[in-house]
Amino acid sequence: MKKIISISASVVLMVTVSFADISEKQVDAYLEVSGAKIMFDNLQQQIGDMVDQQAQQSGEKVDPMALVAVKDVMTRDENFAKFTAHIKTLDENDYKNIMAYYATELGKKSAKIAENSDIETMEKELPIFMTKLQENPPSEKRMNLIKDIIDAMDMDELQKNMLREMFVSVNKFAPAKQQMSSDDIDKMVESFTPMLEQQVQISTLFSYKDFSDKELEEVLNYAKTKSGKAEVDVIFAGLVDYMKAVMSQMFQELLDQEKAK
């Protein structure tokens, strides 16, 4: 069980509106221009790499069937549909405004962040970035902009909600005598909150490292618009529902693998 929890924690820490549903074609167009498609296209390899790394750190060999099971769960169409279902709830006006933003140079630059979020890039560049950060700390203005962007995009809350879903899934499959109450789960999430917030801050600084302060102000201004907030809402809700389904199925698959040994 500890191994399963550790694997799932690695997965988590990695990665509302007027209801005139937009079409599948419009959803696909959004996924393409926003960078979300790249993020999900790379997800299978990222999860496989993280499971492999976690096993190596624990000194255990990865069961190939466990890797297959994890990748299968993460890439099931019905699970991805839980994410896109929320994007479909965007009203036409918000959708047009969001697409207009991603058509701008700043929007295109924002979308490219997903291209640099793969494990290989992060492992190679993040340590270098952290060293530079220590040698030349960001200005107070830049740090405040980063914090405001994190707040506007609900990044901290998203991480906490996704972590909570992991603990809920762990709890569901734990022996009856070891199961936690909802309050206990909330306390566990809160105990991880400082670490999560620090990781979100560092990853956001890294993601926007090539953005000027003026560009950060423009990103923040967009995030505060009605349409920007609508985008945040659907992404937040979609990712939480996606992870809720994935975590439950992943635990079941991994437990089935262990029982079959």
Language model regions located:
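Sec-dependent signal peptide recognition
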Residues: 2-10
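Sec/Tat signal peptide C-region and signal peptidase I cleavage site
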Residues: 15-21
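N-terminal Sec/ER secretory leader and immediately downstream segment
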Residues: 21-121
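Solvent-exposed, acidic/flexible segments
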Residues: 23-24, 33-44, 73-80, 88-95, ...
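Second-shell loop/turn segments in exported
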Residues: 29, 33-36, 68-73, 83-86, ...
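Outer-membrane beta-barrel domain signature
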Residues: 113-114, 118-126, 130-133, 137-138, ...
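Extended amphipathic alpha-helical interaction segments
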Residues: 119-209, 213
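A cross-kingdom marker for long, charged
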Residues: 199-261
